[in-house]
Amino acid sequence: MTFEKYQYYYNEAVKIRQKPEIALAIENQTKLSEDAQAKAKKRYEIEDKLYELYHSIDVKGVDDSIFGGQDLPEHERLIQLMELWMKDDPKINVLKEKLANSGLQEEIGNLENEYQNALYEYFLALIKLDSAINDSRENLFTQEYKDKLKEYADKGVLLYFLETPDAPILCEGITIDDVIESFSFGEFISLKTLFYHFVAQENPSPSMRRKTEDIVSAVDCLEHGQYRTAARTVFALLESEHKNCSAAMDNYFTLDKRVRKGKQRAERIQQLLDGLKEQTYFTKVWDIVNPLYRDILNSKAESFIDRNSIIHGDYYSEQLDITENDVIKLLLLFMNMRMISDHIQLYCEMLRESLKYTEIHIAQELKKEAK
């Protein structure tokens, strides 16, 4: 992409962002995002304190006393624990004694109340942000724009992570190659910006830290012309996201074995999305992403490079001669997969936490009535 072409592309994108309705949507989403980040920080600070307190207590023998050494789903463990507590069953005495001897009951109780409030505020902030983004996608994305997104997706360029229609894909003279190359222009500044929020996370979990390291590594290899190495890393990132997405409710209602086959994972993801029927955007995107990724796993994707020859090092194959744009397309696919995964995991977490606190509240009220 020449400097003149990028300048034209950039100026057209700026014109779109300056439209009053789009500028307002971006401003609103930015404020809601900042609020959600602040609420998330508060939630995780309290969660970390609770984790440290709970893990400072000697709980040896508690599990055997309450559950008899049974391996139970998370929800079933909660139900059994509440039933024992309501009946003042002697089985729960071991836990009561451990808590009493720790001297931390009052502090933990106060923090649990703070955590419930912080969790509620966090979820509410995320729902507001999610709703604002959905409104933008519904009202600001014209049918012509949506059709162009689908046309691009059919050619392996997925831009469904856009929250406002500011990529100038409808502008005269802008081609699909221009859009891909816009991510690599100027030392990959646009691509790095796209993935910046991964790098900017405070105190990420060990798994998230490793994933971020691989994202940085993939972009770095891409920038230095090491396309096959970058592609292998992105294939690993895609595989990880597919697994995480499919396992969002594992071991909650039933004990689930972690599925290893792509087809089984895809079926689980579809089941989870079917349970979130009010959110149609992600279901539509999944209907596009799923067959594409399935074809990639089976080395049948016409719009993407051959995965098997890259992963298994078939150095006699000409399919190993890949380009910069091939890797960018994979990274864009990963961003779309990550968007779907985040959505599913967020709403599954909301479901789990809502059920937990609802059932605890019901148990407390029933015990009061029984006295």
Predicted features and spans:
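Solenoid-repeat scaffolds in large eukaryotic assemblies
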Residues: 229-231
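Charged, amphipathic alpha-helical stretches
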Residues: 1-56
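Helix-loop junctions and short alpha-helical segments
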Residues: 158-220, 234, 238-241, 245-272
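Internal, Lys/Arg-enriched amphipathic helical interaction segments that engage polyanionic partners
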Residues: 72-200
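Short, mixed-charge amphipathic alpha-helical segments
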Residues: 202-207, 270-305
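Charge-enriched, short contiguous segments at helix-coil
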Residues: 290-359
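Extended alpha-helical coiled-coil "stalk/arm" regions
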Residues: 33-91
